[in-house]
Amino acid sequence: NAYRVVNEYDEPNLRRVFLDYGELKSAPALAKTIIEARENQPIKTTDELKEVLARHLPERVRNKILAQIYQAIRIEVNQEMDVLKEFLEQSLEILNPKGRLSVISYHSLEDRLVKRFMKNGMFQGEPERDFFGNFSVPFKTIGKLIVPDNEEIKLNNRARSAKLRIAEKIEL
């Protein structure tokens, strides 16, 4: 749970969480500050965490950075990236040729993973080449990236960051 991440993770792991899942440049300083603060007493609430990290939160971007910190902790606690990877890998096994995979992502980490997987059938690196030197990829992208229009965002503000990608499984 979040309490465990904040109060029991060592500095390198906290740094990894904030860097990998929050994409925070200040991850080393944030991790160090948390480690120092919890030596006195555990950090029990989001308000306490906010207070501990206050010196790293410039007023003009305070809410943005806090959102990234909370996002990073949530992703770690729920193992969201691992679950997404597992789902995408299973889609390869489950989908029949010409079957379609549609995925809505809500932040750049998810979208990067989905985009790379749909393009290469992998999460990192280049796809393998076949005997003739052609890339062997399991999907072809269908249409363009779909994002909500202004009207949709007015109806549902949380949709503002949503991105829908669609790919079709190729017969190999």
Identify the function of each model-found stretch.
Residues 1-172:
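S-adenosyl-L-methionine-dependent methyltransferase catalytic core, i.e., the SAM/SAH-binding region
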